[in-house]
Design a protein with these regions (language model features):
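Glycine- and acidic-residue-biased ligand/ion/polar-headgroup-sensing regions
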Residues: 75, 86-104
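Short acidic-glycine-tyrosine-enriched beta hairpin
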Residues: 90, 105-137
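A short glycine-rich, His/Asp/Glu-containing loop-to-beta-strand
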Residues: 46, 50-75
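A short hydrophobic beta-strand segment most commonly corresponding to one strand
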Residues: 90, 145-160
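Short beta-strand His + acidic residue motifs that chelate non-heme Fe in jelly-roll/DSBH
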Residues: 79-82, 100-101, 132, 137-143, ...
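N-terminal leader/capping segments at the start of a protein or of a new domain
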Residues: 1-40
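Conserved short histidine dyad/triad with adjacent acidic residue
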Residues: 69-84, 123-124, 133-135
């Protein structure tokens, strides 16, 4: 039987309430999200070519405050570097591709202007996932329309988090 959204929600709840460190739970949540994204019935029920651009909540666990969000991006679209503050996120692509970049801040956080350099680039193709712990800087790029599931540890729009501001911050390329 195919892995379902309900099973995924039960699994992430169990992982997050098991007492194990978040650093151990997040990769396992990412594995379970991959299982869900490899269920063609889930993908077909959640996304179609007519699904409007934007974000919608598929599930919210009030005990852990985890959100399972479905995103449709109308590419090409390139996001700026950001993190999820004290929370975390797991990204997974259902259809198309999400190009990810991970960043490192090269100057102290006490300085107002952030100086970032890229440390990793990779593609999340259908079924692939990646977990980003608290404070991990990353950015997304969608070369075309993309259908993505994002799981967050809370409502990340309601907490302080870093967002790259091009008028203030800068990016340096590695030599």
């Amino acid at each position: 039987m195919a892995y379902t959204l309900e099973q995924f929600c039960e699994d992430h709840h169990a992982l997050l309430t098991s007492g194990q460190p978040l650093s151990k739970a997040l990769p396992r949540i990412a594995e379970r999200l991959s299982d869900l994204l490899n269920n063609p019935e889930f993908v077909a029920e959640t996304f179609s070519d007519d699904t409007p651009v934007g974000r919608r909540t598929l599930a919210h666990d009030p005990d852990t405050d985890v959100y399972v969000l479905a995103h449709v991006y109308d590419g090409p679209k390139k996001g700026s570097p950001h993190n999820h503050g004290a929370s975390w996120a797991v990204y997974g692509t259902a259809k198309a591709v999400t190009n990810m970049t991970e960043w490192r801040r090269t100057n102290p956080e006490t300085e107002e202007q952030a100086v970032l350099e890229p440390v990793a680039h990779y593609a999340l193709t259908p079924g692939l996932t990646r977990a980003y712990g608290p404070g991990v800087l990353h950015s997304t790029e969608h070369p075309g329309k993309a259908w993505v599931i994002r799981v967050t540890g809370t409502d990340v729009d309601a907490i302080p988090r870093f967002r790259f501001k091009p008028e203030r911050d800068r990016i340096v390329e590695k030599v």
